[in-house]
């Protein structure tokens, strides 16, 4: 990785959609590891770090709890078939939870639309 490919924390935050505080927190709890440091000691993010942040963004946006995100990060650092199988299982479990949440949201949206239609029916004609 060349220094031109390294991003400041502010750039990584902007591109990932995470705040600087969240990036620091993720590093502190082990979701981000081995962050490169400039000679000044400041953190620098690589393209691989940014790709990893994209995965974390997906997991967070779909409601994965931090504990499960930490487990996923641990498994991502585990080599071999066992680590892969565990990652697949964790992601499949999360996919099921996401599908359940989508189904709930669709039912709630239907309820909202019915309520909107009801209120519109109460308006005077014309």
Tell where the protein language model's regions lie, with residue ranges:
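Beta-hairpin "wing" of winged helix-turn-helix
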Residues: 32-40, 44
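Short glycine/proline-centered loop/turn elements that form peptide/ligand docking sites
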Residues: 12, 19-22
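Conserved active-site tyrosine of GNAT-family acetyltransferases
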Residues: 26, 45
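Arg/Lys-rich, alpha-helical DNA-contact motif
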Residues: 2-9, 14, 33, 47-126
């Amino acid at each position: 990785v060349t220094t031109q490919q390294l991003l400041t924390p502010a750039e990584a935050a902007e591109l990932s959609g995470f705040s600087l505080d969240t990036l620091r927190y993720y590093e502190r709890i082990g979701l981000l590891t081995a962050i490169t440091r400039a000679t000044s000691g400041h953190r620098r993010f690589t393209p691989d770090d940014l790709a990893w942040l994209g995965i974390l963004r997906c997991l967070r946006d779909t409601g994965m709890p931090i504990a499960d995100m930490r487990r996923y990060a641990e498994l991502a650092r585990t080599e071999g078939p066992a680590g892969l199988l565990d990652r697949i299982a964790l992601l499949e479990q999360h996919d099921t939870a996401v599908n359940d949440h989508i189904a709930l949201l669709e039912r709630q949206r239907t309820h909202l639309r019915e309520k909107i239609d009801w209120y519109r029916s109460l308006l005077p004609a014309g």
